Curated annotation (Swiss-Prot):
<keyword id="KW-0808">Transferase</keyword>
<keyword id="KW-1003">Cell membrane</keyword>
<dbReference type="GO" id="GO:0005886">
    <property type="term" value="C:plasma membrane"/>
</dbReference>
<dbReference type="GO" id="GO:0030259">
    <property type="term" value="P:lipid glycosylation"/>
</dbReference>
<comment type="similarity">
    <text>Belongs to the glycosyltransferase 28 family. MurG subfamily.</text>
</comment>
<dbReference type="InterPro" id="IPR007235">
    <property type="entry name" value="Glyco_trans_28_C"/>
</dbReference>
<dbReference type="GO" id="GO:0005975">
    <property type="term" value="P:carbohydrate metabolic process"/>
</dbReference>
<keyword id="KW-0573">Peptidoglycan synthesis</keyword>
<keyword id="KW-0132">Cell division</keyword>
<feature type="binding site">
    <location>
        <position position="291"/>
    </location>
    <ligand>
        <name>UDP-N-acetyl-alpha-D-glucosamine</name>
    </ligand>
</feature>
<keyword id="KW-0131">Cell cycle</keyword>
<dbReference type="GO" id="GO:0050511">
    <property type="term" value="F:undecaprenyldiphospho-muramoylpentapeptide beta-N-acetylglucosaminyltransferase activity"/>
</dbReference>
<keyword id="KW-0961">Cell wall biogenesis/degradation</keyword>
<protein>
    <recommendedName>
        <fullName>UDP-N-acetylglucosamine--N-acetylmuramyl-(pentapeptide) pyrophosphoryl-undecaprenol N-acetylglucosamine transferase</fullName>
        <ecNumber>2.4.1.227</ecNumber>
    </recommendedName>
</protein>
<keyword id="KW-0133">Cell shape</keyword>
<feature type="binding site">
    <location>
        <position position="166"/>
    </location>
    <ligand>
        <name>UDP-N-acetyl-alpha-D-glucosamine</name>
    </ligand>
</feature>
<comment type="pathway">
    <text>Cell wall biogenesis; peptidoglycan biosynthesis.</text>
</comment>
Amino acid sequence: MRKKIILTGGGTAGHVMVNVALIPKLKELGWDIVYIGSHQGIEREIIGRIDGVPYYSVSTGKLRRYFDWKNFKDPFNVLKGVWQAYRLIQKEKPDVVFSKGGFVSVPVILGAWLNGVPSVIHESDLTPGLANKIAMPFATKICLTFPETKQYVNADKAVYVGAVVRDELKDGNAEQGRKMCQFDGKKPVLLAMGGSLGSKKINDALRANLSTLLAEFDIIHICGKGNIDPSLAGQKGYKQFEYVNEELPHLLALADIVVSRAGANAIFELLSLRKPMLLIPLSKAASRGDQIANARSFEKAGYAEVLMEEDLTNESLQAAIHRLYENKDRYQKNMEKAGASDPLQTLLAIIQDTARL
């Protein structure tokens, strides 16, 4: 009899990409797959491009670190989402639920618990996010990317897995990436990206330095939806993308160095590809500090240069990029020491074992 799994997670691409990595492996094993996400989250677009995975949406809310009248309404949206998820899980009868986090995952994990269906949560960041904190007491297993995270969760449920990276990222072709960007190959390539939603601060600082940086680098700029600068279209050596999907492996293969936010999925993908990285984590004022912890961990391991957002200026960005490029060989040697493991297979084994409970 075929096994069935419900996957959930969304809000940002980071809460979806582990699921994207799991889907082909689960299909190879003969699993039926269903996805539960939000009505309008980025997960709907990403999963919608994958054949054979039905998508259902439920109501959800979010945590805002500022006053908003929606903060009073959202708890009721979450309760509505729990009821919707409960009914969907009752109908689909999965053997197990897997969550990658994000606020849409809370109703789904609660719905699984109410139905007596075992669930597995994957926490990417060093410190757990609020959605996972709420959901963890109701989960069967908690898979960790950083071993240090064990101190923040129920140790009896916790399993260190490591970072799950999509196989296709390793299949990039630098020459194909060069053709996409129409670069001539005479300069090293700098790739800058601010996460799936983009980063105005990184975008502004990079563009303010553009003429200086273009003297030394060809630049790929993944700037986020709605953040293309039309005045820079056609600028030699500078290629803008709002968001990339199939193109990303080729662009990463082409890049010599990368400027990035410090979301866990992104930085572990860069680590797996041995890409020297300048990390600019979201500030404490704009987040719960998870990216700062991630960045400091990579800095301590010698994998990354770190520039705090509070210290981000046109001058500091330019100086940090130069330091990164000058020391790229050292960073790559440190990353080689990270060794090889297969977190995806470990995670699959945990999911299969949990489904048998």
